């Protein structure tokens, strides 16, 4: 990550010392925290949301000022419909999570973070207005669909820039949201075996140039950067590749490219 110089970083279950070391290395980066849980139940959503905020606070409070904001559950909404996903319960969980995390602990919450393209843009103001307006940030997962080999293919562009349709739907409905963060970005199949390192880097840079056009977007957290022995996500891993260097060079502050 030393070569990457990212503007947005997502840390999953960081130790306090590791998170502090990341902040020291990247003082201007926006850092999002996430606590992994294998089960994400939504029964009794209000108390569960508040309890999950309490659980996260044990790490988040010592990291106040180090990690900017924290997510709750991850990719709760999949590729089905509102009734299958229990949107009402997911909304209530997020509201309770944000109210407890922000109101009790003074730590910003990130709403959303649903599966890529899982929720119809118009359904966000319809089903999730309270969660979005309560939380200080809104997270989107942006992945080019399976079988697409570049963000810049037509179907890739539509998926990667889908956050604009979500933002437009919220605006039309009068739902206020905090800044957007693309908390995960990539190809659905992973870039390895799909692209060269140079082509993958070009895609991430292209997306950054698009995000820069929208002042309501903080930036993107690329999925992902993992240890070499991580087999589960090896097709997504950018560690030790030219992608780090090429994107890092793009992210470097110069007179021609202000940071």
Locations of regions flagged by a protein language model:
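Substrate-binding cleft of extracellular glycoside hydrolase catalytic domains
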Residues: 14, 20-119, 136, 196-198
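Short, solvent-exposed loop/turn segments at secondary-structure junctions
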Residues: 80, 118-119, 147, 189-191
